[in-house]
Curated annotation (Swiss-Prot):
Biased composition (Basic residues): 60-71
Entry annotated with the keyword Cell membrane: no
Gene name, Swiss-Prot/TrEMBL: rplD
GO biological process, one term: translation
Subunit structure: Part of the 50S ribosomal subunit.
Name of this chain's protein: Large ribosomal subunit protein uL4
Similarity section: Belongs to the universal ribosomal protein uL4 family.
PANTHER family reported in the protein's UniProt record: 50S RIBOSOMAL PROTEIN L4, LARGE RIBOSOMAL SUBUNIT PROTEIN UL4C
Amino acid sequence: MASCVVRDWQGKEAGKATLDLKVAKEASAVDLMHRAVLRQQAHMRQGTASTLTRSEVRGGGRKPYKQKGTGRARQGSVRTPLRPGGGIIFGPKPRSYNLAMNRKERRSALRTALMARIDDITVVKDFGTSLEAPKTREITEALGRLGIAADTKVLIVLTNPSEMVRRSVRNLDKVKLISANHLNVFDLLHANSLVVGEDALTTIQEVYGDD
């Protein structure tokens, strides 16, 4: 079980919160998280790269020049891979890069990644609820009050991010906003600091704390 300080929108301490998740064994934790990240990155690939083989290249099957008497190497087709504009040998074809991973492994990897970043988590009560209009400066100042530098890669996790928060954050290159039900290993490990809403932390505990 890990304990976190809960802060309000002004950065002042507003209580305590706990997170108790079962993590993978130390011997297999790194490998488990690594496979989860590889799987997530592989699923981002479109797999639409395609080249033409000699049977698909435009052009007839005519012989470019006669078999003998030219002094050149013999050629049987203008579509051969040996000629410019010919087919491609062993080129890419559309395929799926998806990698399989058991559900229990995926959940264990996420829990392990989350607990590994527990020292970098800042729990905030009512994050952004006081915003009356979309203002990037308000988010930047709030992160500053939480002790997070402007050039830090930040992951903000909220249960249901409001439209005001979404529009205020989207102009910040170093800040990424996701909902608690879209939590993933890559984002958890990629960010330098994590800002988690108090209600989002409760949701995470409810969803992942039973295993």
